[in-house]
Curated annotation (Swiss-Prot):
Forms part of the ribosomal stalk, playing a central role in the interaction of the ribosome with GTP-bound translation factors. The keyword Nucleus does not apply. GO terms for biological process: translation. One of its GO terms (cellular component) is large ribosomal subunit. Keywords: Ribonucleoprotein, Ribosomal protein, RNA-binding, rRNA-binding. This is Large ribosomal subunit protein uL10.
């Protein structure tokens, strides 16, 4: 699904806000994970109070720029799941 500029800006703003208050971040390659397993993981994440989202790599590079998580920029390759904890 193609995102227009406003959608991209909204995603970057939302995830940037979460990243600002995050204590830690985890980046995971989601290739090979079944839909059922991903659904389980997301449910467990919600219950644990973590923010979990699949975001386009180019947008994630914008999100982490200028944050303590900037060192993660090179890890955004392929289908990437980002998790922030507070």
């Amino acid at each position: 699904m193609a995102l227009n500029l406003q959608d991209k800006q909204a995603i970057v703003a939302e995830v940037s806000e979460v990243a600002k208050g995050a204590l830690s971040a985890v980046v995971a390659d989601s290739r090979g994970v079944t839909v059922d397993k991903m659904t389980e993981l997301r449910k467990a994440g919600r219950e644990a109070g973590v923010y979990m989202r699949v975001v386009r790599n180019t947008l994630m590079r914008c999100v982490v720029e200028g944050t303590p998580f900037e060192c993660l920029k090179d890890t955004f390759v392929g289908p990437t799941l980002i998790v922030f904890s507070h």
